[in-house]
């Protein structure tokens, strides 16, 4: 999701501004990436609907809306009837919502496919299925990348970008690695149906629902401090399904087509780390993007490219 308005939280004004800047870059970024890769990343601009499922939720939404207004975000309160005009399958008991018309979404799987294709078409070499153990440091310079199969030596002019996500601190040789921890997210997808169960991204108190062009309705996502445990849990899946059903009861009979887990790379302050290493001259960190990695893709690419060029 590309949703800086919907995901705005107290105490994260700097992160919100980064998100807005990156969101503004997305249309041109997506168009260029699609031209270079030949892959449609499914950029959609339908907006996000944040729904309350009861009166207590509605009061919380009103309170949170004050912060969005303070930040000047494009978001407004609407009543339940107006919400159902946007999404007719919403529960009849929904008392109100916040409408964020400027939020977008993109398919992250297609995005990765497009980035890979563009990278390789421009001469990049991608090593797959090879575990990275760490970075070999010699005389305060990154001299090689340690793989499970051996050391990949680097040219003297090379710059290493550490973009290892939640696994950043698992790499050896990085004494100043940022403090990044994994936060597990369980997700699932059901059949979107025809006509589709929804057209917009819907955020409920305990789940969000994202319609995809490939016919899936993605439902996510838990946030769990469980290390790198990739398993699904009955409670996690139940919470997602109940949270989604409270907002969109029509999912009740939708077939489940997929379940998966991922690990968000979270920092203490929830802000990403995009900087040079303090101790290794030719090493740059790009990690800790948490729940905003896809949103911040264009901005991160530009900032990291600037760091590499000026290294």
What are these regions (language model features)?
Residues 97-159, 163:
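Helical element adjacent to the flavin cofactor pocket in flavoenzyme catalytic cores
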